Amino acid sequence: MRKTLLALLPAVVFLLGTVTAQAEETSRSFTDDLGRSVSIPAKPKRIVTLHDIDLTIPLIELGVTPVGSHGRMGTDGKPYLRSSAILTGVDFDNSDIAYIGSINADLEAIVALKPDLILTEPDRPTPIEKLEQIAPTVAIDNTKDGAPHIYKMLAELTGTEERLAVLDRRYRAQIDALKASVDTGTITVSVFQPLNGKISVYHTYRALGRVLRDAGFRFPAIIHAIPEGDRIEISAERLPELDADIIFDPYRSDTGTSPQAEIDMMEAVMPGFCDFLKACRNDRYILLPREEAISNSYAALSLMVSAVQSHLTVRPSTEK
């Protein structure tokens, strides 16, 4: 009997090793931006995302469609993924993505989707403690190096590094083309928008800001002083500090707001604001759709490269 057991021992050890290896293949450890070590599926199949612009759109660009996503509620009472229809062609109404709420996530809706991975951000109002009771939950900080960090994390989570490399290669080629046509190092640029009676200014305004920085444009000192990933609000009296050769003002386009409405809001902040800005007096105050400018997606980056290049390339002149 003992000889028989000894003879079977190698086979038992082999089987145990196989089971262990299979378990390791189906899950792995991942450290998120809160420093938490999370056991996640090696190949997640049912992902729920808690932010449309920062998480859902990048996932779609990487070729991964989540089963559920945070979204916004339109004036028609229908949910939508902000900027997604413009940038990816995908929205709730033409995909299998389920709407799981806007500001506060609908936990019951998430449970019903049977996710194997939940993606959130550190500042989302739905507590991670509640989410991780449903499925492994990873927090990705959108203020930590912006889009490059988000995409790197998502690609690692979903095994889509090759797709990310292609997207990034295309963007780098577009930046090189922009720099070849515009002497970016000699041009100062500024990006801001009116908000709640003040002027909102980011260190790097999402896709638009990243394009401007990657292309080598210069910024006013007040913008340089803002910590990376942060923003400030200033009073109208400091508006001249934001002057530059070119000013970009992203207007809210998803709600049907017009560029003129953005100008009216600036007038409300400071009547006759254009008189205080050299860029505005020289017809270099450019309004761009916020839906494209504020996204973290590569599609938005491409659109912003084209927009910046079209406004700044040399034009024919009638002056002698």
What are these regions (language model features)?
Residues 181, 245-320:
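Structured C-terminal subdomain patch of bacterial secreted/periplasmic proteins
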Residues 18-23:
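Sec/Tat signal peptide C-region and signal peptidase I cleavage site
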Residues 73-79, 141-153, 189-211, 254-261, ...:
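Extracytoplasmic ligand-binding site segments that recognize negatively charged/polar headgroups
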Residues 53-107:
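A short, structured surface patch at a secondary-structure boundary
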Residues 107, 111-120, 136, 239, ...:
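Proline-aspartate-enriched helix->loop->beta-strand connector
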Residues 7-17:
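Bacterial N-terminal signal peptides
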Residues 70, 127-165, 172, 258-287:
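Charged, glycine-enriched surface loops/patches
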Residues 46-50, 54-59, 166-222, 229:
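Basic- and aromatic-lined ligand-binding clefts that recognize polyanionic substrates
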